[in-house]
Amino acid sequence: IISNIENYLTHNFTQEGEFIIHPLLVQKTYSETCWIPISDEELIQNKEWQTMIKKAEIKGLSEVMVHNTVCLYKTDDSNWCGKLYEETTFKKLLQDIKDNRYSLPTQREWEYLAGKGCRTIFPWGNNIDFSMNLKHMEWMDNDGEYTLEKENFFGLIIGDDPYCREIVYNEDEFSYKGGDGGRNICGGLGVVWGYFPVSPYFKDKELSIGDYINGGYDFFRRIIRIDDSVKEGYM
């Protein structure tokens, strides 16, 4: 087992190095992709959506979704909101970045934002703290706030859910950090293996990036470099 873990860490984790991380303004939480908000007026006027909401209310549901089409959900104040799925590509995301003059973290910048340069698998150590309240772990007491959804040392919500992978960009290539789309958990590998992908240093080397963004699993975090002429560098 130890040998398997060592091989896994060697193959799926970035290697230790020394880097200079320049000052950044960082979005506190990641943003979802592909989903476009529905206006209140449009939601009220659409008879099909109103029927879906009424059926959900009868069943006591707070959310109803048609895969890659529409999602209707109830907010904390019991109002219903909605969003439409709009297929998008990494090329479109890159254009949006250029048009709106923000950036995405590089791989090493994201690792620092999530781990603060820690030399352990997770920011808190090399193993799962079983007192944590973790998402997708049915055997845990999931009442209340999830532990990893709290602000970290930089005030960021980051690396909190293995199903949610963040898009990073460096050297003209997109890649993922912070999750594997839930593959390890869905594969029945348990809490430790299932949560390896939230490690600051996890990198799925076998995963290839296609043309299209997966709105169910792909997220992004805007950053602004104080001096946009520099990124992280080697020491």
Language-model features, listed with the residues they occupy:
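General N-terminal targeting signals
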Residues: 41-43, 48, 121, 139, ...
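A short linear-motif detector with a strong N-terminal bias
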Residues: 3-7, 101, 144-145, 198-204
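Functional-site microenvironments in short loops/helix caps that host divalent-cation chemistry
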Residues: 71-188
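Extended beta-strand/loop cores of jelly-roll/beta-sandwich
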Residues: 1-104, 210-235
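Glycine-rich loops and low-complexity Gly/Arg-rich segments
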Residues: 49-54, 128-131, 190-194, 201
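Low-complexity, flexible helical/coil segments
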Residues: 59-66, 140-142, 200-209
